[in-house]
């Protein structure tokens, strides 16, 4: 991380903090007034973004904020994140615009089991026949359509069609297809099975490590210390930050575009001589700021414990 007394570094850090605040607003799904079932409060969650190749065989096929990634291989393709209940049509159109076939999807993966990242899974699995692979901890949630979620399971507006999991993943598991290997890193806390995906890819004769961050954010209302449905939440967050800080990262990506300033980098990608998504400093700063926000909230709750839910 750059020295804090470096003016340029301080400017970059302020940018990260601004993004972090915006991300918190975008992902604080329990902070908004309850909305009708599957209403989409953020227009960037549903507004399409032209699909594009990030690097090598890794492509972006999501909306302006809800990230979905296509990893192409010689033996079919892997999709990361099905997003909202309304998202499969947009994701399919993006995949086909890139020249790939919808029914060539072999595996479906997710970042975590919140409805804005996995509500479309049942439809995609039904249409493509892909195998669904989910991290332990999130499996009961996706198979119950969100009802087993420790925070949102009783709120109808955050439920979605249940989907059967074909393979239960564990930390460091490898997902292999054709000549591609992805590694699942458990970075729990945000959900019990929140997953950060990593892969090594080749682009322009160089090797890059891509990191797709699941979510290290503490949503408003999370009881870090005394949640009877998730008593190890704080410990899981701490372990997740340890993992995130240990990962090498060249290409900084995530479950929401706001995590990594996607829209600005997308515009730069069109004209820049270097790949704008190569941002190891941005990755380190984002993780550090999220960890700082977690530590601050944990200290606050230790001083003033939240009411334990029934």
Task: For each feature predicted by the language model, list its residue ranges.
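N-terminal secretory signal peptides and thylakoid transit peptides that target proteins
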Residues: 2-27
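Metallo-beta-lactamase
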Residues: 38-40, 48, 53-55, 104, ...
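Divalent metal-coordination and catalytic microenvironments
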Residues: 57, 71, 81, 112, ...
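Divalent-metal (often Zn2+) His-rich catalytic cores of metallo-beta-lactamase-fold enzymes
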Residues: 199, 204-206, 218, 229-309
């Amino acid at each position: 991380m750059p020295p804090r007394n470096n003016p340029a570094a301080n400017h970059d850090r302020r940018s990260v903090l601004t993004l972090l605040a915006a991300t918190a607003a975008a992902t604080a799904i329990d902070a908004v007034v309850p909305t009708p079932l599957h209403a989409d409060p953020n227009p960037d969650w549903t507004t399409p973004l032209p699909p594009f190749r990030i690097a090598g065989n890794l492509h972006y096929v999501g909306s302006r904020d809800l990230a979905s990634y296509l990893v192409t291989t010689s033996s079919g393709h892997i999709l990361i994140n099905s997003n909202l209940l309304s998202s499969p049509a947009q994701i399919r159109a993006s995949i086909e615009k890139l020249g790939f076939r919808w029914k060539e999807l072999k595996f479906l993966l997710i970042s975590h089991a919140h409805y804005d990242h996995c509500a479309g899974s049942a439809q995609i699995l039904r249409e493509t026949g892909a195998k669904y692979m989910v991290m332990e901890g999130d499996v009961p949630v996706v198979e119950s359509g969100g009802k087993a979620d420790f925070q949102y399971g009783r709120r109808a507006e955050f439920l979605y069609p249940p989907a059967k999991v074909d393979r239960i993943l564990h930390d460091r598991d490898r997902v292999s297809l054709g000549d591609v290997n992805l590694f699942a890193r458990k970075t729990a806390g945000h959900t019990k099975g929140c997953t950060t995906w990593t892969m090594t890819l080749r682009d322009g004769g160089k090797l890059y490590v891509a990191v797709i961050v699941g979510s290290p954010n503490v949503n408003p209302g999370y009881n870090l210390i005394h949640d009877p449905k998730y008593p190890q939440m704080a410990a899981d967050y701490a372990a997740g930050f340890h993992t995130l800080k240990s990962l090498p990262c060249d290409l900084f990506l995530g479950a929401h575009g706001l995590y990594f300033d996607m829209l600005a980098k997308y515009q730069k990608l069109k004209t820049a001589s270097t790949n704008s998504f190569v941002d190891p400093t941005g990755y380190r700063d984002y993780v550090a700021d999220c960890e700082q926000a977690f530590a601050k909230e944990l200290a606050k709750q230790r001083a003033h414990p939240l009411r334990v839910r029934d």
